[in-house]
Amino acid sequence: AASDVYKRQDYLHLTSNETINGVQLREFNKIEHDSLLIDMSSDIGSYSFEWDNLAYVYAGAQKNMGIPGVSICIGDEKYLNSEDNSRYLNLGQLVEKNSLLNTPPIFSIYVLKLVTDWMIAMGGINHFEEKSIRQSSRLYEQLESYGDFVIIPVSDYSKSRSNIIFKFKNEDLEKKFLIEATEKGILGLNGHRSQGGIRISLYNSITDEMVDYLSEYIDRFFTDNGK
């Protein structure tokens, strides 16, 4: 069985939120492996999780925690050093040098500090998890009510809260949806170039007011186009 194969490995690497297809994994403690490495670049800071079987978590800051140029690494000390890794890939060396193996991206680090201060002031992880659940649930329920027009190609148990993916059954209607959204100042709804469709990204900076505006547009569009 596949599970027996990965249990025998030294570690198991996962991406917690797959942004192209809108698939998310949050309950890491249900995976039967005691050394998980998780890339959380697109959903770090948006929900709480158990750390019992995690060896390392890392994330680029640019989606939820700041701007490009800096990554966040959180891990167990016993996984830091490896003789097989080049110096720039050896996290133990990075820790030993206080993240100063090279000239650090000062502004990116400063923005990360501002964002984390803001997150704490807003109520911390609990606030952003509640917001993520509220916003994503609202939009999924709304889109499911327009099942005559759109398809959500993700199983309920693996739907991403960060990236809502759906496709129109009518390609011309999809193009019209994107054009009119842009005219109303709603940008970045195009799906990944390899998949097409629509992608709604609900990162930590997205407010309820933004979701309200998008939701109103969705209702108005489908009312004007057949429902």
Predicted regions and their residues:
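Short, small-residue-biased leader/transition segments that mark boundaries at the very start
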Residues: 1-6
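Active-site C-terminal subdomain of aminotransferase-like
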Residues: 61-140
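Catalytic PLP-binding core of fold-type I/II PLP enzymes
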Residues: 23-52
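Short amphipathic alpha-helices in soluble, non-transmembrane regions
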Residues: 176-183, 213-219
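A short linear hydrophobic-aromatic micro-motif
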Residues: 149-153, 185-191
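PLP-dependent enzyme catalytic core of the Aspartate aminotransferase-like
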Residues: 192, 196-227
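Structural motif
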Residues: 11-15, 37, 58, 72-74
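Conserved PLP-binding catalytic core of the aspartate aminotransferase-like
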Residues: 150-180
